[in-house]
């Protein structure tokens, strides 16, 4: 994403400027879909589309051709249903929770049934309504998180009447180690999935997440289910990231100062200035999704220059050592880059000792948000939308 934001541009009272490139999002979707042209390609938009705004993201993906969307909770599904065309199918990964049957049926929400109990609930509701209801059925192929156990699958295979009133859209599972192409679990889960699918003849299979798409044709099946790769995150630990960056984060400077040698910086005085040091305090901290684990190890960037974090990350602010820049380069209102061309999601996640998913979904609501629409110039987008 070639986003040119003036380094003297104030953030309009916000802690910083979060820019979301919807054109790159669309391109990532089309790239992933193009890897398996015989398959459909869904989009995982749970957690407010990984923190980027499910309403805007989902509409962009729908316009790109996506017709299947996955969220985690029923409330996410209901909110999305109000914004998307009736042509879109919305799946709830956490399944059918007690009391949600009426809402799912009335709003055409498709639960992912993860247990015999959930299957019984949905079947009973179908009988009560006197109509067939759609669902996906998830199989636990080795992650031990959600889905029918081998014992439950055996019972279901022997008692197909348990599915009375249910039309199965997909039988599905989730890969635990797809981002590690050589992990033995991938082939093991594939074998279990293939065997499990025989209990549902003629039913389409949904198996591949972002990493799974890159494991090859054996993993593609009827429906792909990417998440992090849509948003520019690396789908695999093997090789360079093939996805376009979707997010850029620039944070405003709120004060600069020069401190003498021996000064203790930040909470606990965990950084000591060994020489006279120029510092800049920026207006974002761990409340804004920049983890405390970045203390004394992470950095911001300015025009290709790394600016190390000096001391501990605070709730609302971070102190940077800006001694590498000419004096006067940064002033109040200047913007430094936290995520962008010089520092990817994976870079900042590595410094924080976490994963790109956690960084992305943790970005707070205090940033000024701008969306670059497909075909829109960055200069126009930088002042076009403020999503809070």
Swiss-Prot record:
Binding site for substrate: 145, 315
The entry's keywords: Isomerase, Pyridoxal phosphate
Recorded catalytic activity of this chain's protein: L-alanine = D-alanine
Single GO MF descriptor: alanine racemase activity
EC supergroup of this enzyme: isomerase
InterPro entries on file: Ala_racemase (IPR000821), Ala_racemase/Decarboxylase_C (IPR009006), Ala_racemase_C (IPR011079), Ala_racemase_N (IPR001608), Ala_racemase_pyridoxalP-BS (IPR020622), PLP-binding_barrel (IPR029066)
EC numbers on record: 5.1.1.1
Biological processes annotated in GO: D-alanine biosynthetic process
Chain's role: Isomerizes L-alanine to D-alanine which is then oxidized to pyruvate by DadA.
HAMAP family linked to this entry: Ala_racemase
Name of the protein described by the UniProt record: Alanine racemase, catabolic
The organism's taxonomic lineage, starting at the top: Bacteria, Pseudomonadati, Pseudomonadota, Alphaproteobacteria, Hyphomicrobiales
The gene coding this protein: dadB
């Amino acid at each position: 994403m070639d986003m040119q934001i003036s380094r003297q541009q104030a953030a309009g009272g916000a802690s910083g400027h979060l820019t979301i490139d919807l054109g790159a999002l669309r391109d990532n979707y089309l790239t992933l879909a193009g890897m398996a042209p015989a398959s459909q390609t869904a989009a995982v938009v749970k957690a407010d589309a990984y923190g980027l705004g499910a309403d805007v993201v989902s509409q962009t993906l729908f316009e790109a051709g996506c017709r299947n969307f996955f969220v985690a909770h029923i409330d996410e599904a209901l909110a999305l249903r109000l914004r998307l065309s009736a042509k879109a199918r919305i799946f709830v990964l956490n399944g059918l929770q007690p009391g949600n049957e009426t809402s799912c049926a009335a709003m055409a929400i498709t639960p992912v049934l993860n247990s015999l109990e959930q299957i019984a609930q949905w079947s009973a509701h179908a009988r009560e309504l006197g109509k067939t209801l759609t669902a996906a059925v998830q199989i636990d192929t080795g992650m031990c998180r959600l889905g029918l156990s081998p014992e439950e699958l055996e019972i279901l295979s022997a008692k197909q009447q348990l599915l009375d009133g249910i039309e199965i859209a997909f039988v599905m599972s989730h890969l635990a180690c797809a981002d590690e192409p050589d992990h033995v679990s991938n082939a093991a889960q594939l074998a279990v999935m293939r065997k499990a699918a025989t209990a549902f003849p003629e039913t389409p299979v949904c198996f591949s997440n972002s990493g799974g798409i890159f494991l090859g044709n054996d993993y593609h099946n009827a429906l792909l289910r990417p998440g992090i790769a849509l948003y520019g995150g690396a789908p695999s630990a093997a090789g360079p990231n093939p996805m376009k960056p979707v997010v850029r984060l620039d944070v405003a400077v709120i004060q600069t100062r020069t401190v003498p040698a021996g000064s203790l910086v930040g909470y606990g005085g965990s950084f000591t200035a060994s020489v006279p040091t120029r510092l800049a305090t920026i207006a974002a901290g761990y409340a804004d999704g920049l983890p405390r684990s970045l203390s004394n190890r992470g950095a911001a960037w300015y025009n290709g220059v790394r600016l190390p974090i000096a001391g501990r990350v605070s709730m609302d602010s971070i102190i940077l050592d800006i001694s590498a820049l000419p004096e006067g380069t940064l002033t109040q209102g200047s913007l430094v880059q936290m995520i962008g061309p010089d520092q990817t999601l994976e870079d900042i996640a590595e410094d924080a000792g976490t994963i790109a998913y956690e960084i992305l979904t943790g970005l707070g609501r205090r940033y000024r948000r701008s969306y670059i629409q497909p075909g829109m110039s960055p200069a126009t987008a930088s002042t076009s939308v403020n999503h809070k």
